[in-house]
């Protein structure tokens, strides 16, 4: 089963996403900031990193670029749990694809 690392400053989103993946049978670890991410990557490399596009404490786009530069084969998905106002900017800046989910207090609802 793939090892997934979730990075996001918002504990409620990070926990919901981590628990959802864990219940689906994935090995999941989560961190709340970029320093913890780099520390984690110094010890072990996950199969996939999920990176919150709207973290205030670190530049998600810059962090994505740094991750891909240091670990070109590392799969990184940029996610967001807020409004879709910057979707085009995010996709144009770094993403090969963008998966959008609407967040409600009870979970994620897929939308196109």
Identify the function of each model-found stretch.
Residues 8:
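Conserved acidic carboxylate
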Residues 30-48, 88-89:
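Acidic, metal-coordinating helix/loop segments flanking the phosphotransfer/catalytic sites
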Residues 11, 32-36, 59:
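Acidic phosphotransfer microenvironment of two-component signaling modules
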Residues 51-67:
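Conserved phosphotransfer microenvironments
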Residues 87-112:
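Receiver (REC) domain switch/output surface
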Residues 67, 73-85:
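A short, hydrophobic beta-strand element within the central beta-sheet of small alpha/beta folds
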Residues 11-29:
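Two-component/phosphorelay signaling modules centered on CheY-like receiver
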């Amino acid at each position: 089963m793939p090892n997934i690392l979730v990075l996001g400053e918002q504990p409620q989103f990070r926990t919901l996403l981590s628990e959802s993946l864990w219940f689906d049978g994935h090995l999941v670890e989560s961190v709340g900031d970029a320093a913890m991410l780099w520390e984690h990557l110094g010890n072990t490399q996950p199969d996939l990193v999920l990176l919150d596009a709207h973290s205030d404490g670190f530049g998600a786009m810059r962090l994505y670029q740094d991750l891909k530069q240091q670990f070109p084969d590392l799969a990184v998905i940029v996610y967001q749990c807020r409004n879709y106002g910057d979707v085009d900017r995010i996709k144009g800046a770094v993403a090969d694809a963008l998966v959008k989910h609407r967040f409600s207090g009870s979970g994620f609802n897929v939308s196109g």
